[in-house]
């Protein structure tokens, strides 16, 4: 990406291809500077050669300019694109991919944590002498199972966004029809923020659920954590009445499993936040922090709607539809239960509503844990190579795999450093003796 300047007129940033190395000698081309950025944090992206790049003085031939939408003729004439919005495409492509890929990363973390917490036994439940798996405790289930539902939502909705973009590319790429591209651009902007935040916090939650072993690089969490068409927004129609929302009729926890109730709560939440954002903007207040809550609330509604659409598209005879329905309910209740920031709880719920929501949430958590969790995780079919974790091996327990990894560590074969360590220890002892002697002399 570089600024295009023709006859001292700046036409803004454009895309170019630049040859970095000589194909015969592998030496850098004149004017190119490349620097390797060093080790990667948390063992992530180790196979990617990230670096810094500078072009202090490089001439780029005209034929190395990406010229599908904009051209520079041989006489220097600039031919602008038919529509500037087509430049969204590269960003939309990357964000559409991220919306799904982050979901797979979170699923891997959940699978590893599930394997470990179902193996790890600690403490006995009342009236039972046998130790219980850590997964049986609510403190673990309430952390992992909502993440399983959210990761599934990220995958299925991310796939829908990517399909919508592929369909747009096939039909309208060479036309002036951009309304759908603008919509996809906005969707992928929100999806990127929503999916990366949920995945980032989710992977860390899975790591913490594995206790001390989650800190080990052998667990794989560090690597996972560092690598992760929808309809128009119907909540906009709610905005007109955001300041005086209609009462929500909930008589029992089961009412919260109805989509009309879920849709009302999520739409009303977004509408209220939009109204607040407009008022704050008009008053000149800094909305950068509150805008994030609005983005996440909007993401809740979009992913909720997309998840249920994906469930509805599953044929009724498919065996996995029941599990997907329950996961969709768990996702719905989880996003209604947890506010993204403290200042923005669900504004439309009364105390009685919240009590019903908690009871419904508890019931769905138990149902997923006892009937669906293992089948869903197994259905994703992650291989040991994909998980790359000592905590999720089929032929070894987590403790055996961790010990095996410890025995293979290069640090076990550092005999060539032992003499240096001994000499260093002697130097420190001598320094301590010298300090003690100097102290005695000063007293005398």
Give short role names for the model-derived ranges.
Residues 1-444:
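Flavin-dependent oxidoreductase catalytic core characteristic
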